[in-house]
């Protein structure tokens, strides 16, 4: 609106008072193209990171365990999962333009390893006659199908009216309940799974999040999830429920090695039957992404996502999955819980997501940081 937005001249140009300018700066986290100060953007991006980090590395932990990989390759898989998620998120936050083609949605969505592919990943990786090279090869070639979906999506969007996308969103929300309850009880690999202290600490996190969201103002409300997680982490650490040994033994710097699997043979193996399976899974993943992008747009921005944003999001993920295949990472997809945070807090700045993505990438090169 006239008088509310600055021009490209002096920073104060377009604002009546310094107070009005500062107020606009403070509201930058609630604008898609808002550029909040780093000290404001970082904790909000870190909040998104915390909401997806465990879910992002669990598929790699499961596959590494089932495939009986040694500690080096297990750590490498986790590193690559963090790198893949960071690159995919960064591409969504800051799309690349190639003429009229847009690679990335430009919407506030957080990317990570998708569980849609987990059953086939476990089956292929644990089969001695197949292994990870077959998995990454099929994943790489099948990602081309997402390119096709991205280009035809504007023409088939009429088959996804609000009633359909609304149903998808509800289904995504319901599916998160079982995952949330499982993690609340202790999560994967916790020997104290289901014990009372897990429920009490989890309950504390929920209470803090709800209280900050309902009664907090400004950053307290916007960072409600981060505050809740930190509160739970501190209580767990004081109670002796946090193991810091993995942090002490982790390296400060390590470069994720591409095409690391193959045992002297090809690191990528292409089998048509598995490529076809992955093509189907990529379509399912695209539908889920449409739902998550709709949640972020409607909940955070108060509007429906544009055709360009949806197709750009699918296309961006296609290229992210190709990158992931080369860097020993499983296919990526949008994380519903992170879109839910956008809808709850209204923090929809792409720069906030960008700081979260850059933190993920930094963690991929610093195992000690990832161990936190």
Describe these PLM feature segments.
Residues 94-107, 154-159, 213-224, 345-350:
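Membrane-helix interface "capping/anchor" motifs
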Residues 2-15, 66, 71-78, 193, ...:
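Flexible hinge motifs at transmembrane-helix junctions and intramembrane kinks/re-entrant loops
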Residues 60-66, 118-126, 154, 183-185, ...:
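Generic transmembrane alpha-helix signature in multi-pass membrane proteins
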Residues 30-37, 262-273, 306-307:
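Helix-boundary and loop/linker segments of multi-pass membrane transporters
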């Amino acid at each position: 609106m006239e008088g509310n937005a600055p021009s490209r001249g002096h920073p104060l140009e377009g604002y009546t008072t310094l107070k009005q300018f500062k107020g606009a700066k403070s509201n930058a986290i609630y604008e898609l193209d808002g550029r909040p100060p780093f000290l404001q953007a970082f904790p909000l991006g870190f909040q998104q990171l915390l909401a997806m980090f465990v879910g992002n590395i669990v598929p790699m932990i499961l596959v590494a365990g089932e495939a009986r990989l040694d500690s080096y390759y297990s750590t490498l898989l986790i590193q690559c999962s963090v790198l893949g998620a960071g690159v995919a998120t960064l591409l969504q936050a800051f799309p690349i333009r190639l003429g009229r083609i847009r690679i990335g949605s430009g919407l506030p969505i957080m990317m990570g390893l998708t569980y849609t592919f987990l059953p086939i990943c476990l089956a292929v990786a644990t089969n001695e006659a197949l292994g990870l090279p077959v998995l990454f090869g099929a994943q790489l070639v099948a990602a081309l199908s997402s390119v096709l979906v991205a280009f035809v999506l504007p023409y088939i969007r009429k088959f996804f009216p609000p009633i359909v996308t609304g149903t998808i969103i509800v289904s995504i929300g319901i599916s998160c309940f079982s995952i949330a309850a499982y993690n609340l009880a202790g999560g994967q690999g916790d020997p104290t799974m289901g014990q009372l202290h897990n429920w009490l600490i989890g309950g504390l996190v929920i209470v803090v999040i709800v209280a900050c969201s309902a009664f907090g103002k400004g950053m307290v409300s916007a960072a409600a999830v981060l505050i809740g997680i930190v509160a739970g982490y501190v209580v767990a650490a004081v109670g002796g429920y946090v193991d810091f040994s993995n942090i002490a033994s982790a390296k400060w710097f390590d470069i994720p090695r591409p095409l690391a699997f193959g045992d002297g043979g090809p690191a990528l193996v292409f089998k048509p039957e598995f490529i076809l399976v992955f093509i189907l899974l990529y379509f399912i993943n695209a539908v889920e992404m449409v739902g998550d992008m709709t949640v972020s747009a409607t909940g955070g921005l108060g509007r429906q996502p544009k055709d360009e944003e949806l197709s750009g999001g699918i296309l961006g993920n296609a290229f992210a999955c190709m990158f992931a295949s080369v860097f020993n990472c499983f296919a990526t997809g949008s994380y519903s819980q992170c879109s839910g945070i956008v809808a709850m807090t209204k923090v929809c700045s792409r720069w906030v997501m960008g700081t979260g993505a850059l933190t993920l990438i930094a963690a991929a090169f610093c195992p000690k940081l990832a161990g936190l």
